[in-house]
């Protein structure tokens, strides 16, 4: 199959993943609302996990196909890209406010879980099922933390639940769930197959394709959400969404994947893991030292320069 066709299939796969996740979340959330499940529970489970569905589907599919470098590359690459590129672009457009709990708790937590992921993976070269359970226990603890914040009236994903509309029958919503789920599964298969073929065509490693193209594709929803929030003046949402996404990527995506099938964590990810930890630390320092505890334009420029340097390192490596 030609390289051009594989590139088209990769784009199609990304579209299927993103649209499938949207439909699945909408259908599942609205059905849950119909059955009287509290908004806060829907927001912290269906909505929050659904937004990480593209990363999870690609990572699980890649691991099952024996392409573990795409699995880890997707997560590590997405987390680096989310901060350096997405927050970099957004903060250059408009300085980003950061909530107190995000600066004091969530960003440090990102640094901690990123370091834990690197330790678990590099200690013996595998994220085992036991490691996956450990990550999931931490994920549950994070959900409890978000639940407590929401009960205190602090904005979280619990506020992003789709509202029921006239004509939202159970049958219609079930179709959204089934079609959305099918698109996620099919889209992940198309994406992984196309990404693997492209890597072979260019003589690239699956690690490189996972850290770059696949990571960028699965991070598109975060890019759109953050830039839109910044432009609309809801800048505090932008940083919160990215930080939450990075935590979910490690604890939910890698944790779930490892429980299903142990994931090989190649030694080649050592530098990338260090960069991922440093990236989260850079976010903390940039906000902590920023005027009025904001991620300023200067901070955004530093992040974009850092992303450019890392990208050049990947291409040369």
Predicted regions and their residues:
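Hydrophobic alpha-helical segments, chiefly the membrane-spanning helices
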Residues: 1-317
